[in-house]
Design a protein with these regions (language model features):
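Compact, glycine-rich, soluble single-domain proteins
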Residues: 61-75
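Hydrophobic "anchor" residues
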Residues: 56-57
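C-terminal binding/interaction regions
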Residues: 2-38, 86-146
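Active-site- and interface-proximal helix/loop "cap" or "latch" segments in soluble metabolic
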Residues: 70-72, 80-88
Length: 146
């Protein structure tokens, strides 16, 4: 640590970032519950946690149908956030049934960009939990069409 305490501040910031990603991962894992709810609908094979700008965390699971009416876990979590009166996304994590992370699909990225047209580039997405790799939505969606 130098006389300005920069190393300490950086270490504290890193720990805080690790803590929030751990919390998001744990919340997603808690709702991850793959199951069949009918002959043609499976749910819970992917779970997502979205941290709103307020710090509140919203979760959702995927709903896979025999038609196009299903929904991804990330959009389900975002809709949960919006239902609860929030619209500013800070961080997103999506967990597959094996505990590994997934990147949001094109439809989920598109919704994030449309919900936060002026700030979508700042949204952070963890793409590898074990290696702690985080990318911004700008990195994942560099050429948004609007």
């Amino acid at each position: 640590m130098n006389k300005y305490g920069l190393v300490k501040v950086d270490t504290e910031r890193r720990k805080s970032m690790q803590d929030i990603w751990d919390k998001l991962y744990e919340k997603a894992m808690k709702v991850l519950n793959p199951r069949k709810i009918s002959d043609i609908v499976e749910v819970g094979g992917v779970a997502s946690a979205v941290e709103a700008e307020s710090g509140n965390i919203y979760v959702g699971v995927c709903i896979d149908c025999a038609c196009t009416l299903g929904i991804c876990a990330e959009r389900n979590a975002m809709f949960n956030m919006i239902t609860n009166g929030e619209s500013k996304i800070k961080r997103v994590i999506a967990v597959n049934c094996d505990g590994k992370l997934l990147t949001p699909c094109g439809a989920c990225r598109e919704l994030m960009t449309q919900v936060m047209t002026s700030d979508y580039k700042k949204i952070e997405v963890m793409i590898d939990y074990e290696k702690r790799i985080v990318k911004t939505l700008e990195e994942l969606t560099p050429f948004w069409w609007i």
